[in-house]
Design a protein with these regions (language model features):
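Acidic-glycine-rich active-site phosphate/pyrophosphate-binding loop
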Residues: 1-3, 52-59, 104-119
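Residues forming the flavin
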Residues: 5, 9, 108, 135-140
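Glycine-rich phosphate-binding loop plus the immediately following alpha-helix
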Residues: 5-42, 46-49
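Glycine-rich phosphate-binding/hydrolytic loop that grips phosphoryl groups
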Residues: 20-24, 28, 125-144
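Histidine/lysine/aspartate-rich catalytic loop segments that bind and position anionic ligands
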Residues: 39-65
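Adenine-nucleotide phosphate-binding core of ATP-dependent small-molecule kinases
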Residues: 57-90, 129
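Glycine-rich phosphate-binding loops at beta-strand->alpha-helix junctions
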Residues: 90-117, 128-132
């Protein structure tokens, strides 16, 4: 941030695979809430989720459940896969500080893992999920 404005910005606009929606879908497949997934992940050993596509990852999670893989391991694997994707995007905007907006911000474990992977603090806020909507409203107001 320079002069109150965002200097570098990275966004996953290709698919849902690095988003809060991805976590919602995976939590639903596990039969738990996103908050429960974060708590479960704390005690899990990461199971590799190799699919980058939400549809294929969902099938992979269903298969893991069917094979009896512990849900905490799947939860950890899902979160680690999202964090890895986000860290790759954030790494393109080299250097701290990092700010995270969107649905992922509501998962404290995601924010914690992302900070660990980037080796730098990640800042967010309670309204971060609505950053896009707030920005659109400010822009619309400026146009009127």
């Amino acid at each position: 941030i320079k002069g109150g404005r965002v200097a570098k910005f990275a966004m996953n606009d290709k698919c849902a695979a690095g988003t809060g929606r991805f976590l919602e879908i995976m939590a639903d497949r596990l039969g738990i809430s996103q908050q429960q997934m974060a708590v479960l992940a704390l005690s899990g050993e990461p199971t590799k989720i190799s699919s980058m596509c939400t549809v294929f990852a969902e099938s992979e999670v269903i298969s893991l459940i069917g094979r009896g893989e512990p849900r905490e391991n799947i939860a950890r694997g899902v979160i680690d896969s999202v964090v890895s994707r986000v860290a790759t995007m954030a790494g393109q905007a080299t250097g701290a500080p990092y700010y995270l907006t969107g649905g992922l911000c509501e998962n404290a474990y995601v924010v914690e893992r992302l900070a660990a992977l980037l080796g730098s603090p990640v800042t967010t806020s309670p309204q971060a999920r609505f950053a896009g909507a707030i920005g659109a409203a400010i822009r619309a107001q400026a146009l009127n």
